[in-house]
Amino acid sequence: MSQNYYQILGVSKTASQADLKKAYLKLAKQYHPDTTDAKDAEKKFKEINAAYDVLKDEQKRAAYDRLGHDAFQNQQSRGGGGNHGGFHPDINDIFGDFFSDFMGGSRRSSRPTSAKVRGSDLKYNLTINLEEAFHGIEKNISFSSAVKCDTCHGSGSEKGETVTTCDACSGVGATRMQQGFFTIEQACHKCQGNGHIIKNPCKKCHGMGRYHKQRNLSVNIPAGVENGTRIRHTGEGEAGIRGGNSGDLYVDITIKPHDIYKVDGANLHCKLPISFVNAALGGEIEVPVIEGGKVNLTIPAGTQNGDQLRLRSKGMSKMRSTIRGDMLTHIHVEVPKNLSKRQRELLEEFKKESINEKENDGSFFNKMKSLWS
């Protein structure tokens, strides 16, 4: 017993039109003779088309369900149900999605194509120092790129020569070939898909409308740029082919590590060495800042090693903003290794008078334990 139309498409009798179409497209792609070498592909493909031709039509489907498979076919053979044997799917409606997937892209437009091709984007890695990132800077860079031909002005044709429309494809850039139910498009062999013919190509660019050379360009790096920032320079990439638009240039910023500062977003961190005397007594010391020069930093009396002191608005600038980050100083208390006789005497006297240096009472051990908390 032969399969009925529902079985051929692999759907139930209650399948919706959307389910029918989905099943049909899947099977049509699988069994189309151009996509498989299976011996029975052509036969299966005809069965699939015949089944879908009936089931996609609500009136035919109702008759098919009422009469059954064999009776419906007998009626069709007597001419009672129309001529579905010559069924030709609407290529734009039924197979639009199929062609998009199977042919690797969307269907081509019937409008003439342009021979102009946009140029490629370029990437340039630029390394700057932290001060340059803070202030902003103009940098001159050099790179190899395709540039618009100054002889033919990008047309690809010798000066005074005209570009003619391809007579093989009428300027479309593609030719069509009918294969059964399908219309296949391919690039025109005469114009290579350009849509026009350059009879006398420019000798300097060999008809491409561009050639390669070393370029020099001044690029602006804004103040507050961060490591890893990508800056786009529109139209500074490679020139297009035969007058097409130029691509873009992307400058990727790398900031070199600094000898003093570590960057944390807009904040700067630095280690600040101070004497144990300044740590104990407090005072003011000068510290360098990223914009140049120095500022005074107040050291509170009793400052401990590892304490962090903040200088507000002395960090990095922010792009397109007047707000700055902070500078955070991490205190490193230095203990002198070489003492003069007088310094030693004073420290010995301080030691005797200190009541917090008694190592035998409980307070010393409590301090030791607190260092772990």
Curated annotation (Swiss-Prot):
A single Gene Ontology biological process assigned to it is: protein refolding
GO MF terms held by the record: ATP binding; heat shock protein binding; unfolded protein binding; zinc ion binding
Q: Which key words tag this protein in UniProt?
A: Chaperone, Cytoplasm, DNA replication, Metal-binding, Repeat, Stress response, Zinc, Zinc-finger
Q: Which residues bind Zn(2+) 1?
A: 149, 152, 202, 205
Any one of the GO CC terms = cytoplasm
Enumerate the Pfam families for this protein: DnaJ, DnaJ_C, DnaJ_CXXCXGXG
Q: Where are the CXXCXGXG motif repeats?
A: 149-156, 166-173, 188-195, 202-209
Q: Which domain of life does the protein's organism represent?
A: Bacteria
Looking at the keywords, is Cytoplasm present? yes
Q: How does it assemble?
A: Homodimer.
Function recorded in the entry: Participates actively in the response to hyperosmotic and heat shock by preventing the aggregation of stress-denatured proteins and by disaggregating proteins, also in an autonomous, DnaK-independent fashion. Unfolded proteins bind initially to DnaJ; upon interaction with the DnaJ-bound protein, DnaK hydrolyzes its bound ATP, resulting in the formation of a stable complex. GrpE releases ADP from DnaK; ATP binding to DnaK triggers the release of the substrate protein, thus completing the reaction cycle.
Q: State the name under which the record lists this protein.
A: Chaperone protein DnaJ
Signal peptide (UniProt feature, chain positions): none
Instruction: Look up the record and name the cofactor or cofactors this protein needs.
Output: Zn(2+)
Domain free text: The J domain is necessary and sufficient to stimulate DnaK ATPase activity. Zinc center 1 plays an important role in the autonomous, DnaK-independent chaperone activity of DnaJ. Zinc center 2 is essential for interaction with DnaK and for DnaJ activity.
Q: Please verify whether the record's keywords include Glycoprotein.
A: no
Gene that this polypeptide is encoded by? dnaJ
Query: Boundaries of each J domain copy?
Result: 4-68
Please report which protein family the annotation says this sequence is part of.
Belongs to the DnaJ family.
